[in-house]
Amino acid sequence: MKAVACGGLWLLTAAAFAADTVAFKFDFGPGAVAPGYVQVLPATVYSSALGYGFEPGATVTGVDRGGHDPLRGDFITSDRPFFFSARVPAEGNYRVTVTLGDAAGETTTTIKAELRRLMAEKVHTAPGQFATVSFIVNTRTPQIAPAGDIETGEVKLKAPRESIQEGWAWDDRITLEFNPGAAPGRSCVCAIEITKVDVPTVFLLGDSTVCDQSREPYASWGQMLTRFFKPGVAIANHGESGETYRDSLGRRRLDKILSVMKPGDTLIMQFGHNDQKQIAAGTGGPFTTYKAEIKQHVDAVRRHGGIPVIVSPMERREFDENGRIKPTLADYAEAARQAARELQTAFIDLNAMSRPFYEALGPEQSKLAFARPAPDKVDNTHHDNYGAYELAKCVVEGIKENKLPLASCIVDDFGSFDPVHPDPVGQFDLPASPFSTIRPPRGN
């Protein structure tokens, strides 16, 4: 299969797309059904027998405006977040194309996939206007197929967290969240197409500050990264709360990635917060085991034709009396920096970028970049949607600075980002997902 640029490097050719097969084509609403589409009504609830439908709790209404366009003349609408799932035939990458809009009213829709991966941000349509958005969703199962030096088996998931609370990340379906935001917002979904595609994959490995957090108010830069890439590349987040480079090896998360990695794919990895605890336990340190385990990951990725990228761990929120961030992870950031230099690997210094970001906000306003599970409590390690969004921008800027191949797939509206001048926190307005928790992620 031949690949050409994402506007220069990575989009598949038309001949390659001809080999893709449409898994599903859905027409939402009670009106006439477009040829080749399956109708979805408000009462279409997901079941294993049906293989598609709304997840329980969806409060949706069907509207038919009539007209000559069966795809856009009717739709499913709601002023509350709702979820729609479709079972897919195999793990891998799928291009999802969604048609939004209403012939007679305004709509606003934010789309997230699986565990709150941000795919489309606040898509607005005026009355009579329709928008079609496309993005790539990566799906996976715990099973590991043999590939080269990788033996068959499965990822050692953490139950019940990964098997139940985070089950959408490991099941055989694509789950989409449609979120209208605050009143009087409303989402109007006209159609969805889901197509299996062969595109380059960017794998992520990391801890709770990287992984797809399933519940508000917690969020990570990994689940925001999808927002900043065109549909010529997939983001596959294999991070998990409470983990280390050693856990990545022991729980076979790296093996899972290597079993599906193709030449030219990328692995971006960031650990450190939990690795640091090995010092007190007497089981490791930054310039010994941590660096050695980074090397194990880099060597394995290169054996499989991948591109490794090392990211230093962002700082915690802890200010000194002068309003400067205290360096709580300096040794691990330096060890990551040394490993990247010695291994001649791309390096994103998120530790260095996080400090001016927090300091630009200051001791008080920086609280608004971190999760606040209760009115009087701030989690100074884990971020909220705003903090995760800004750190994702730091990572994207690092991808640009390293001139990585996937930089050509960065969305056009990104421009550049300087953590010294973050987006105004008061202007950030990403709709929150409906599920929340007061329990911190593992490894807090």
Give the residues covered by each predicted segment.
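N-terminal secretory signal peptides that target proteins for export/translocation
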Residues: 1-2
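Bacterial N-terminal signal peptides
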Residues: 5-15
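Compositionally biased, intrinsically disordered or flexible polar/acidic segments
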Residues: 19-215
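Conserved beta-strand scaffold positions in the cores of enzyme catalytic domains, especially
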Residues: 25, 235-237, 344-347
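Short, flexible loop segments at the rims of nucleotide/cofactor-binding pockets, characterized by
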Residues: 74-75, 243-248, 324-326
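Short, structured coil segments at secondary-structure junctions
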Residues: 113-114, 231, 304, 343
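Conserved SGNH/GDSL esterase-like catalytic core that processes O-acyl groups on lipids
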Residues: 170, 179-187, 195-204, 209-300, ...
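Alpha-helical cap/lid subdomain in secreted, periplasmic
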Residues: 252-412, 420, 431-444
